[in-house]
Structures are given as structure tokens and as C-alpha cells.
Amino acid sequence: MSSLENKNIIVTGASGGIGNAIIKKLSEAGANILASGTRIEKLEELKKNFEGIKILKFDISQSDKIEEFIENATGELGGSLDGIINNAGITQDNLAIRMSLDEWQKVININLTSTFLMSKFAIKKMLKNKSGKIVNITSVVGHTGNLGQANYTASKAGIVAMSKSLATEYAKKNININCISPGFIKTAMTDKIDDKFKEVIISKIPSAR
């Protein structure tokens, strides 16, 4: 039996490419899944493809509504929460000297601040269970930096550091917090990246793809 069998798990950013793949694996493992994202048509598609999955449209930029979202999502899962995968995020690329304050703050707020708040309110639920797991999806560029992505790389590096702090705070409460830092993956989000930036990213990959 899978260790994820009947575990209640929230997945944000589920309407995107990586989120879709995460849902597939969790479903195969027998987890109870609440899929969240901004594109309802994609969420409805997930509901058709994966039996028993629950969906809830939510935009993580609404930071003042994240606590309510966690409450509602946990309720949809039967009242308890075993895990959350914080996968939602955005890019808004520009060279540093051209990057507006709004471009900087928007990416930091959505990627970093919202991930913190999702984790914070999920931990409150997990403390009641006396266990839980959080997986934060970051990026390899959060470790290496990248041309035209000062805001995005800072947000992802921040998630790594934040996750280490949260892991230290709650390890003795049987709550594990980890990060996964994927490389460049073709998704709807990365398709929006300027072709010149894509070339720079791909040139740093040994297999050049």
C-alpha cells in the first residue's frame, strides 16, 4: 500500500503543466486530492480525468483570502489536512534596469509571500493532526540566478530559505517541509518566456534541451 493512500493533499497551481503531472502521480498513489488553480476549464478537465478529485478555483495573489482558502479546501477533504504541494507561481521577466517596482513586487508577492501564507495556514491544520508534509516547488534558477529574472530567482531562493526555517521550526512536531527545484520544463508558463531568455537557459543545460 502506498504511503499516500487516503492522505488528504492540496495541490496549488494544478491547472498548469507541472501541477497536472503532480496530480497524476498522487492519483496513482491513491491520495485524496484537492486541486486548485485559476483556470476553471483546466480544473474541470482534471476532474474528468481523475476519479474522486476535488477542485477549487483560487488565485493565490489574493493573500488576504488564503486562510479562508485553506479552511475551505480542508473542509472539502473531510476536515483534516495531511499535505500541501505549493506549486503555483508566475514569471514576469525583464532586465534589472528595465524592471518596474510593480514587476518586482508582483512576482515576490505571488511566488514567495503566498507560499509562506499557504504554508503557515496549512501548518496550523497539520498541528491538529500532529503530522503533515509540505512540498514547495521552487526552481534551479533560485540556486543559480538567471538573466532577466531577478524577481523570479529571488522569489524562488526565498522559498528555499523560508522552507529551511519552517522545517527547523516544525520538525519536532512531525511536520516535514521540503523543496523540489526543477530545471527548465516546457509548460504554458515557460512558453511565455522571451526566446532569447530561453536560449540562455537551455545553453546552461548539459543536454541542451
Question: What is each of the regions a protein language model found here?
Answer:
Residues S15-G16:
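Conserved glycine-rich cofactor-binding loop
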Residues L95-A96, E103-I108, T190, F197, ...:
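Substrate-binding pocket helix/loop in short-chain dehydrogenase/reductase
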Residues F58-F69, L101:
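The beta1-alpha1 cofactor-binding region of Rossmann-like NAD(H)/NADP(H)-dependent oxidoreductases
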Residues I97, T144-A150, K172-K173, A208:
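Active-site loop immediately N-terminal to the catalytic Tyr-X3-Lys motif
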Residues S139:
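Residue(s) in the substrate-gating loop at a strand-loop-helix junction
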Residues S119, S155, S163:
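Active-site helix of classical SDR
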Residues K124, T168-K172:
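Alpha-helical segment proximal to the catalytic Tyr-Lys
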